[in-house]
C-alpha cells in the first residue's frame, strides 16, 4: 500500500511539474545583437542611413548613420553620426550650410511583457548647431528608442521554427514573460519565464 501511494504521489508531482505554465530562463544579449536590430529596424535605407528630413534624392537633408551600441554602467548607449545640408534647393543643389556631428543617447532597458523596451532616454552628446539639434533631439529621444523595441517572443519563435532541420526536434515557444533587463558588464541580461515544447 505505501509503495502504491508513493508511486501515485510521484506521478502527481511529475504531472504538476510537466504542466507548469513557465520556467525561469536567463538570456544574455550582446551590444552587437542590439546594434544589428537597430540597423535592421531603423537604419535600413540606402547606405544604412535614416533620413530625419528629406531623402536620398533631396538636395537639402538631415540623416543619421553608423549606429554603434555599447553598455555603460546600467545604460545602453547608442552613438550615431549625423550629417545635414541646410538651405534652399536650387536646381538640384542645396545652397546653404553643411554640418556633420556625432551624437550619443543613453537608455535604460525595460521589460514589457514579451518585449524589450527602453525608457529614460538621455542625450549625452549633441552638436554645436541649434538647428541640427532641433531635429536630432526628437529623433534620439523618441524615434530611436521606439524603433529599438524588440518583441523577444517573436524572435525566439523565428529561431525555433527551424529547430527540426537543425536538431531533429521540433521546439516551440508557448509563452514568454520578461521580468527584468539589466546591463551587466558587456551583456544585457534578460530574466524571463518561458514555456517551451519539444516534439
Model-derived regions, located:
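Cleavable N-terminal signal peptides
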Residues: 11-12, 22
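Extracellular/lumenal and peripheral-membrane lipid-interaction modules
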Residues: 23-199
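N-terminal signal peptide c-region/cleavage motif recognized by signal peptidases
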Residues: 18-19
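Bacterial N-terminal signal peptides that target proteins for export
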Residues: 1-10
Amino acid at each position: 500500500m505505501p509503495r502504491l501511494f508513493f508511486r501515485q504521489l510521484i506521478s502527481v508531482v511529475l504531472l504538476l511539474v510537466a504542466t507548469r505554465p513557465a520556467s525561469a530562463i536567463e538570456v544574455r544579449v550582446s551590444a552587437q545583437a542590439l546594434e544589428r536590430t537597430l540597423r535592421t529596424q531603423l537604419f535600413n535605407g540606402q547606405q544604412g542611413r535614416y533620413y530625419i528630413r528629406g531623402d536620398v534624392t533631396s538636395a537639402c537633408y538631415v540623416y543619421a548613420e553608423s549606429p554603434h551600441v555599447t553598455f555603460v554602467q546600467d545604460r545602453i548607449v547608442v552613438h550615431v553620426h549625423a550629417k545635414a545640408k541646410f538651405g534652399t534647393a536650387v536646381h538640384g543643389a542645396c545652397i546653404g550650410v553643411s554640418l556633420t556631428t556625432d551624437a550619443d543617447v543613453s537608455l535604460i532597458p525595460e521589460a514589457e511583457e514579451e518585449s524589450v523596451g527602453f525608457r529614460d532616454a538621455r542625450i549625452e552628446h549633441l552638436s554645436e548647431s541649434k538647428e541640427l539639434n532641433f531635429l536630432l533631439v526628437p529623433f534620439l529621444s523618441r524615434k530611436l528608442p521606439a524603433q529599438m523595441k524588440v518583441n523577444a517572443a517573436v524572435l525566439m519563435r523565428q529561431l525555433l521554427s527551424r529547430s527540426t532541420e537543425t536538431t531533429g526536434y521540433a521546439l516551440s515557444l508557448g509563452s514568454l514573460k520578461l521580468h527584468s533587463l539589466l546591463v551587466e558588464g558587456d551583456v544585457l541580461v534578460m530574466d524571463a519565464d518561458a514555456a517551451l515544447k519539444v516534439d
